[in-house]
A protein has these predicted regions:
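Conserved core of the sugar-phosphate nucleotidyltransferase
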Residues: 95-180
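Short, high-confidence coil segments that cap the C-terminus of an alpha-helix
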Residues: 44-45, 82, 110-114, 174, ...
Length: 203
C-alpha cells in the first residue's frame, strides 16, 4: 500500500496580500507550505505538491491547475502508485502529525474517505439576495478541514469542481467519514489569519 500526500499550492492568495503565491509566503521564518510538508512526510511514502508553473521541479513539484480540483487531479496523475491519498491545504500550516495519523487510521474498509472537520459553533443563515431564507440546524453542521484521506481509486473516479475533494467523492456516491479536527488547524486567508498563525507557531 502506497500512501501519497497531495498539497494543492498553486493559488495566488490575493486576499493575503503577499507578493508571492500564498503557499510560499513566509510564515514563521519559512515558506508556509513547508510546515505542512513536514507533517505529511511523517505519514506518507511520498508527497506531491501542485505549484505555479514557474516553481515546477519534477517529479514531486508538478504544475497546478486553474482551480483547486484541477491541481489535485494533476498531482494525483503524477502519482500512479498511490493506493491511499492524503490531501492537505498548504494554507493550513498548523496541522499536526497526530491529526493526519488519526485521519489515516479512520479509513476503514467500508469508507471511501475520511475528513477532518469541526462542529460549527455560530448560527448559520441561508441568504438569497440579502434576505434570510433559512436557518439550518447547527447541530448537524461541521466545517470541513484538511487532511482529507481517500482511497486513490475513489478520488481518481471523482470528476468536477469543488472547494473540497470530499464533495466530489460524495457526489459519486462514496461514503465519507468525519473525525473531529482542531480549531488551531484553520485556513490562512487574510493577513489577520497569518498573524494569529505566527503567534501559535512561535509557542
Amino acid at each position: 500500500m502506497s500512501v501519497v500526500g497531495i498539497v494543492p499550492a498553486a493559488g495566488a492568495g490575493e486576499r493575503l496580500g503577499a507578493d508571492v503565491p500564498k503557499a510560499f509566503a513566509v510564515l514563521g521564518g519559512r515558506p508556509m507550505v513547508e510546515w505542512s510538508l513536514d507533517v505529511l512526510r511523517e505519514v506518507c511514502d511520498r508527497v506531491v505538491v501542485a505549484v505555479p508553473p514557474d516553481r515546477v521541479q519534477p517529479p514531486d513539484f508538478v504544475a497546478g491547475g486553474a482551480t483547486r480540483s484541477e491541481s489535485v487531479r494533476n498531482a494525483l496523475a503524477a502519482a500512479p502508485e498511490a493506493s491511499i491519498v492524503v490531501v492537505h491545504d498548504a494554507a493550513r500550516p498548523l496541522v499536526t502529525v497526530e491529526l493526519a495519523r488519526r485521519c489515516l487510521d479512520a479509513l476503514e474498509d467500508s469508507y471511501d474517505g475520511v475528513i477532518a472537520a469541526i462542529p460549527v459553533t455560530d448560527t448559520v443563515k441561508e441568504v438569497e439576495h440579502g434576505d434570510v431564507v433559512g436557518t439550518p440546524d447547527r447541530g448537524r453542521l461541521w466545517a470541513a478541514q484538511t487532511p482529507q484521506v481517500f482511497r486513490a481509486d475513489a478520488l481518481r473516479s471523482a470528476a468536477g469542481e469543488a472547494t473540497d475533494d470530499a464533495s466530489l467523492v460524495e457526489k459519486m456516491g462514496g461514503r465519507v467519514r468525519v473525525i473531529e479536527g482542531m480549531r488551531e488547524n484553520f485556513k490562512i486567508t487574510t493577513p489577520l489569519d497569518a498573524r494569529v498563525a505566527e503567534m501559535l507557531l512561535a509557542d
